[in-house]
């Protein structure tokens, strides 16, 4: 992703307006403005505008995980690739764009999400996004693309896992697949 961004003229690790991004989790309660398309795992779009902010974690959270006092959040809007609609007010984990790692573990995300549901607190919850210039076939699962470039990975797959990987990758293409083998 960073190599492709560099080729496109992006000079920083940080997200920029025009970046292609992908959601890494389902957020069924967040829908686009016109078509009411939900934000799901694998939703791809273009970052249209944003600002960076920092949120304080609530007391109950910091008591349980004292090493995390606050989280950098990118608040922005995304133009959907599939239908030119917009998702607005997305609260994205800034660190995940920079390092590829979420600031919060799944257990911490669950804790903070449940806390917000109980209290009705409108605090920002960091959602998982990353760049979408090159994605794994697992991230593309459920989506379809005109052209797919698939590398036959040299992982220690069992035979059936290797076949599932190839099947998942190949079936993402609607027009053309290029398979790069060893």
Question: What is each residue range found by the language model?
Answer:
Residues 1-182:
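Core RecA-like ATPase module of SF1/SF2 helicases and allied nucleic-acid translocases
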């Amino acid at each position: 992703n960073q190599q492709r961004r560099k080729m496109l003229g992006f000079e920083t690790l940080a997200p920029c307006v025009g970046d292609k991004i992908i959601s890494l989790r389902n957020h069924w309660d967040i829908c686009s403005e016109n078509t009411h398309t939900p934000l799901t795992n694998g939703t791809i779009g273009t970052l249209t505008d944003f600002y960076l902010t920092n949120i304080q974690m609530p007391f109950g959270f910091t008591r349980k995980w004292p090493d995390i006092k606050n989280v950098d959040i990118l608040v922005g809007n995304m133009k959907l690739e599939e239908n030119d609609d917009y998702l607005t007010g997305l609260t994205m984990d800034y660190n995940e764009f920079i390092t590829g790692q979420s600031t919060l573990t799944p257990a911490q995300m669950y804790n903070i999400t449940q806390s917000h549901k109980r209290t009705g607190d409108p605090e920002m919850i960091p959602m998982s996004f990353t760049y979408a210039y090159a994605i794994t076939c697992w991230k593309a699962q459920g989506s379809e693309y005109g052209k797919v470039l698939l590398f036959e990975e040299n992982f220690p797959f069992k035979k059936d896992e290797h076949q599932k990987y190839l099947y998942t990758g190949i079936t993402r293409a609607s027009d053309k697949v290029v398979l790069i083998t060893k």
